């Protein structure tokens, strides 16, 4: 699959800002550490001033290695024969830096691929050109950043405004991505097409002689529903219609979260499932390869669908990396579970296959991820007869088209990760509890919905501390006909973690058995799948930055309905 570089453009940042007419409408995250530190440590409240932004230009002292103008706007793309499809997409222009730092996926609604090296300084001038009612902000999923650069929904800007990101990349080599993160609107905006990849390289990775260039293939898995006119359907409405230009026809309640009667409640509870699998923005995707080794860098970019990845040949998958890093050494799995927001890095060796051979990457059947109301209701939100969550599906085809010789060998050692020891956690004997449950028809964390500017005392951690968190996906007796819950991919902003243990309630072990061997818990992660009745312990160190960060379910309809909380890192 060809990836095209976006070559340097003579347009300057000044031209970009003048052209938008936003010289006075520019917003950049201001330093808010002083505001946070002014909160008394004895106080029982950690209410944070709302939307602490200042209308000003970029920091003149910040000299970027890479500068990018990034616009979110409606456009049309060809997806199926016939009428073009209305989407919302990120478009980028390189203002400064290596031309190879910005690439496109041709004829796709997906945003650019940004490639950087660890230690580089990046400026992104993000402009919101979405329809009225669509506030937005960009979250750099997986990057460790200061709070005002992370994409917290409290910094969301309205249409016609610009937000300037300025940060140094401190991450290890890994596959990250970026997507919208406004409160109550993330699901719709991401579904409409707003997503891109952010790939970090470092000196350690460069020594490993992994496949690069045309042999390093990004794979973005999504599911979508199209109507007879090739238009995207989301919660019963077309993307781009007047109804959908303001929260998809949903009204916004006092909580700031979208609702639309029973339809809105069911969508937030079950999540949206699409009818067709899209790969890199296209259905019916075929990857043409040679008889050699490839590196497949796979993102689950779906709103709510979970995949159980496996080769049709029965060969095991060879994994070299996950969310936040390469692994310490390669590992093999017969299948890999990949929940929304998770990434996996695959060493794919086609050297023993003959030209003309075809194999496919499939999602195998699994059970137990939906246990609400005694039946699988996720398809209710699909705008049609979408495959149920856990259904077997073909994701994409791989066709061996030519012979090619190469000498790459799978390294026995990959990354030297700074792994933590569980006993070094300040709360090793009493992990911080994170309870996932159903409250009415809304999923909540520790019994609380999202509050934009609040972190409770029990949601406050100390900078440079090591902690254990224990996520419990509990049963919900008395809720929705004794609902036993759903799988929740939990994402933490601002930190990487290690998964140190898993266990499940005996009454839900049958479903868990269909997924447990596909967890890749080695390495550093930022998103973890938690099955109904499952208890997962995480280990992490809160370093580099203080401030307010979110943690939430990455089933985007759950997030939009309030399954998100803040945590505060305090110096």
Question: Which residues are covered by each model-predicted region?
Answer:
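N-terminal secretory signal peptides
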Residues: 1-15, 22, 30-34
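Repeat-solenoid scaffold signature
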Residues: 336-338, 342-367
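Histidine-centered copper-binding motifs that mark active-site loops
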Residues: 2-9, 21, 41-339, 346, ...
């Amino acid at each position: 699959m060809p990836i095209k570089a976006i070559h340097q453009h003579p347009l300057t940042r000044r031209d970009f800002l003048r052209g938008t007419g936003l010289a006075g409408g520019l917003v950049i995250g201001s330093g808010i550490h002083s505001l946070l530190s002014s909160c008394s440590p004895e106080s029982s409240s950690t209410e944070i001033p709302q939307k602490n932004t200042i209308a000003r230009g970029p920091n003149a002292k910040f000299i970027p290695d890479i500068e990018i103008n990034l616009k979110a706007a409606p456009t049309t793309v060809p997806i199926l024969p016939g009428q073009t499809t209305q989407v919302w997409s990120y478009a980028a222009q390189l203002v400064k830096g290596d031309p190879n730092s910005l690439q496109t996926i041709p004829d796709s609604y997906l945003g650019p691929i940004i490639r950087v090296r660890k230690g580089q300084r990046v400026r992104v001038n993000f402009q919101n050109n979405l329809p009225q009612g669509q506030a937005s902000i960009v979250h750099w999923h997986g990057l460790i950043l200061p709070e005002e650069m992370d994409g917290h929904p409290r910094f969301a800007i309205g249409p016609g405004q610009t937000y300037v990101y300025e940060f140094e990349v401190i991450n290890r080599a890994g596959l990250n991505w970026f997507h919208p993160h406004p409160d109550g609107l993330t699901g719709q905006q991401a579904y409409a097409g707003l997503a891109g990849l952010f790939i970090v390289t470092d000196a350690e990775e460069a020594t490993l002689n992994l496949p690069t260039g045309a042999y390093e293939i990004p794979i973005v898995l999504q599911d979508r529903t199209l109507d007879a006119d090739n238009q995207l359907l989301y919660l019963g409405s077309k993307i781009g219609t007047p109804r959908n230009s303001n929260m998809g026809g949903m009204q916004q309640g006092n909580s700031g979260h979208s609702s639309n009667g029973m339809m809105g409640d069911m969508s937030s509870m079950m999540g949206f499932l699409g009818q067709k699998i899209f790969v890199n923005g296209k259905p019916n995707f075929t990857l043409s390869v040679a008889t050699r080794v490839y590196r497949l860098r796979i993102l689950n970019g779906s709103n709510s669908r979970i995949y159980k990845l496996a080769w049709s040949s029965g060969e095991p998958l060879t994994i070299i990396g996950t969310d936040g890093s390469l692994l310490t050494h390669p590992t093999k799995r017969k299948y890999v579970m990949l929940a929304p927001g998770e990434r996996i890095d695959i060493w794919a060796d086609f050297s023993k296959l003959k030209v003309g051979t075809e194999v496919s990457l499939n999602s195998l059947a699994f059970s137990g991820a939906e246990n609400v109301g005694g039946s699988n209701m996720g398809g209710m939100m699909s705008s049609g007869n979408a495959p149920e969550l856990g259904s077997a599906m073909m994701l994409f085809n791989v066709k061996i088209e030519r012979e090619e010789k190469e000498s790459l060998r799978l390294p026995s050692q990959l990354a030297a990760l700074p792994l933590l020891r569980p006993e070094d956690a300040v709360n090793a004997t009493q992990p911080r509890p994170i309870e996932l449950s159903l409250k009415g028809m809304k999923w909540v964390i520790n019994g609380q919905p999202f509050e934009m500017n609040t972190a409770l005392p029990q949601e406050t951690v100390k900078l440079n501390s090591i902690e254990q968190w224990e996520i419990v996906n509990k049963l919900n007796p008395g809720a929705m006909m004794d609902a036993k819950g759903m799988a929740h991919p939990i994402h933490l902003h601002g930190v990487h973690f290690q998964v140190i243990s898993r266990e499940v309630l005996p009454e839900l072990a049958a479903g868990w058995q269909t997924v447990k061997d596909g967890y890749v818990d080695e390495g550093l992660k930022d998103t973890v799948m938690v099955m109904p009745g499952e208890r997962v312990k995480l280990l992490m160190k809160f370093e580099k930055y203080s401030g307010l960060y979110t943690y939430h379910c990455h089933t985007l309809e759950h997030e939009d309905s309030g399954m998100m909380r803040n945590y505060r890192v305090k110096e």
